[in-house]
A protein has these predicted regions:
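Alpha/beta-hydrolase-fold enzymes
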Residues: 122-208
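Glycine-rich nucleophile elbow surrounding the catalytic serine of serine-hydrolase chemistry
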Residues: 112-122
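Active-site nucleophile elbow and catalytic-triad environment of alpha/beta-hydrolase enzymes
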Residues: 213-227
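Active-site glycine-rich loops that stabilize anionic/oxyanionic intermediates
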Residues: 31, 35-39, 114-115
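Alpha/beta-hydrolase fold nucleophile elbow
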Residues: 103-114
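N-terminal cap/lid segment of alpha/beta-hydrolase-fold proteins
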Residues: 1-25
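Alpha/beta-hydrolase active-site loop
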Residues: 80-100
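Conserved alpha/beta-hydrolase
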Residues: 41-75
């Protein structure tokens, strides 16, 4: 059974959209999802339903600036001006605490994909005690510290000139360009995301997967990766 609910974000303003998938029988284990950049948790519905058939309770939230965890269209790809990365991590922890109260006696696992895997790695450092296991999927290798610093500096400069809600094609290309280069000639802007052409076409045509991150979100993401 699939249900939706909201809970207050750590940013103090946003209601975090959440989906839970419940198995029909006894819950054998819990899996909490942490989705990637420029997507949303309902994209994992087919996967979650499969796990439900195996006895898993699956739950996940849309991160700040994603899916239905926004107050307006201008908030897509925006976290929080000062504490964005910490707020996203805090929301993951809030959901885990709520879920553990429902199912305190079963194994608890977390899965993070792409940006969500980076968040999960940070989460484990801060709140990992008690987790039964974690799946780090589509994650990044060790990042160049100089490049991260340059990325942060560029975002700060652009924020001074344009504001933290500014969407920079330059920063976006710096982050995603290397992935695209390996898939030429490219049929879409996101050939690197999946080899399943049907899923790829659904992805690129989905307005909730088509926005550009603000310099705020990129800056906060770079800060998190540095941790």
């Amino acid at each position: 059974m699939k249900d939706e609910f909201y809970f207050p974000s750590k940013d103090g303003n946003t209601e975090i959209h959440t989906i839970e998938w419940k198995p029909e029988g006894q819950v054998k284990a819990v899996l909490q999802l942490s989705h990637g950049m420029v997507e949303y948790v309902d994209r994992y519905s087919e996967f979650a339903e499969y796990l439900c058939e195996k006895g898993f309770y699956v739950v996940g939230n849309d991160h700040l600036g994603h899916g239905k965890s926004v107050q307006s269209k201008s908030e897509y790809g925006f976290f929080n001006e000062k504490y964005g990365n910490a707020c996203v991590l805090g929301d993951l922890h809030t959901l885990r605490q709520r879920t553990m109260k429902k199912y305190p006696d079963v194994p608890y696992f977390m899965l993070g994909h792409s940006m969500g895997s980076s968040l999960l790695r940070q989460y484990i450092q801060m709140y990992g005690n008690g987790l039964s296991g974690a799946i780090i999927m589509g994650t990044m290798s060790e990042q160049n510290k100089t490049e991260l610093k340059l990325g942060k500096d560029l975002c700060r400069i652009l924020a001074v000139l344009k504001g933290w809600h500014y969407r920079s094609k330059l920063v976006d290309k710096m982050v995603n360009g290397p992935f695209c280069k390996k898939f030429k000639p490219a049929r879409t802007r996101a050939d690197w995301v999946t080899s399943d052409t049907e899923k790829l076409d659904q992805y690129v045509s989905d307005p909730l997967c088509s926005f550009v991150f603000t310099v705020n979100a990129y800056y906060q993401m770079f800060c998190g990766i540095q941790q």
